Amino acid sequence: MKTISSLAAIFVIALFASPAVASEQVPFNGSWVSHETYDVQFPVMFVHGTATGYATRIGRYTATYEEQVDLLTGSSVGAITLVAANGDVVFATQTGQGDPTPDPDIFSIVEVSTITGGTGRFVGATGTFTIARLVDLTTGDSSGSFSGTISHPAP
């Protein structure tokens, strides 16, 4: 009877310990190269973009993003979708801030992205990452990097 009670206790502990292990935060860092187009309807600028890069936990990826920028403050809100080479997806919402640089055509952009889920191995994913990039507003070309953390259920 004592053995059965011990086995039952181990099973219960393992059952409740598994979700904690699955949600462990791990580094999520990557490169960022993008191109975006703009639709200005003052005082809002709508941004439509595509990006490529390489990231930990995802490998090579492509991304699409949509943002609304308040031209009076430089702040933005939006959403981003990252697609891994195998088709697994990470979804995130983001808030950002754009600031001018000494070159009037170049802006420094910092965006904080909150992971809201995904598909494939990223179902239930959570975490945050910060994208820091420079964008040339005359061409729409942008480059930078991101860093943060991601958690997702174990495979």
Each model region followed by its residue ranges:
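Beta-strand-enriched cores of mature, soluble protein domains
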Residues: 21-155
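Bacterial N-terminal signal peptides that target proteins for export
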Residues: 1-8
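N-terminal signal peptide c-region/cleavage motif recognized by signal peptidases
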Residues: 17-19
